[in-house]
């Protein structure tokens, strides 16, 4: 990496993986890539990119916002003509289905500053993907995988687990990155479900969970007042007393609540 005179940009949440062993572990978790199109976010100088290409995917699309890094992929582009493309773009604004066809897998060391927003974007179109192997800050990974009655359980947990099977695979120490972040990172695997675990309007569920978890220490009868004018009927139809706090509700209970709420 020194030969490239690495100057990671904090504004873009750049932290490059130093360990080839970790890179190999990440790509291996995605399984066979032979018949799949693959999307990579923030390829940086191409360490993860090279390992993905070694698995001989049908096609690899890398999305890089930093124009100064795109030029470092010329050799890979020449070596894998017709099977590799890198575009300069903000991943939050990319419409993946316009660039690659199914089946699609995602493998990415996500930039810290857009990881949650990007994952939520993908959840809204989750059936497009076969699986996703993603690195987050450990704190974010724990929010995604959290169970009810835990401090990390929230809107992100509910939405993620409603739509996917998710597993936290392993943690990575700060020393394995350049520059060294202040926090641990975690790799998770995401397998979209054929259908959501429970029938629900996702927009309503999102608004509901965000509203009540913004007041997570309040009982539901109080936190629901911000989004519905008929709290009593909503609770009765959802078979809830109102004494519950948001963190105690299961995903099924949240879906039942969302299906019975009349939004303001």
UniProtKB/Swiss-Prot annotation:
Gene3D superfamilies named among the record's database cross-references: Ribosomal RNA adenine dimethylase-like, domain 2, Vaccinia Virus protein VP39
Positions with a binding annotation for S-adenosyl-L-methionine: 15, 17, 42, 64, 90, 109
EC number: 2.1.1.182
Keywords: Cytoplasm, Methyltransferase, RNA-binding, rRNA processing, S-adenosyl-L-methionine, Transferase
SUPFAM superfamilies: S-adenosyl-L-methionine-dependent methyltransferases
Catalytic reaction annotation: adenosine(1518)/adenosine(1519) in 16S rRNA + 4 S-adenosyl-L-methionine = N(6)-dimethyladenosine(1518)/N(6)-dimethyladenosine(1519) in 16S rRNA + 4 S-adenosyl-L-homocysteine + 4 H(+)
GO MF annotation list: 16S rRNA (adenine(1518)-N(6)/adenine(1519)-N(6))-dimethyltransferase activity; RNA binding
Gene Ontology CC terms, in alphabetical order: cytosol
A Pfam family matched in the record: RrnaAD
Record keyword Methyltransferase present: yes
Superkingdom as given in the UniProt entry: Bacteria
Broad enzyme group: transferase
Subcellular localization: Cytoplasm
Entries under InterPro entries matching the protein: KsgA/Erm (IPR001737), rRNA_Ade_diMease-like_C (IPR023165), rRNA_Ade_Mease_Trfase_CS (IPR020596), rRNA_Ade_methylase_Trfase_N (IPR020598), rRNA_adenine_dimethylase (IPR011530), SAM-dependent_MTases_sf (IPR029063)
Role noted for this protein: Specifically dimethylates two adjacent adenosines (A1518 and A1519) in the loop of a conserved hairpin near the 3'-end of 16S rRNA in the 30S particle. May play a critical role in biogenesis of 30S subunits.
Family the entry assigns: Belongs to the class I-like SAM-binding methyltransferase superfamily. rRNA adenine N(6)-methyltransferase family. RsmA subfamily.
NCBIfam families: ksgA (TIGR00755)
HAMAP family linked: 16SrRNA_methyltr_A
Name of this chain's protein: Ribosomal RNA small subunit methyltransferase A
Native organism: Wolbachia pipientis subsp. Culex pipiens (strain wPip)
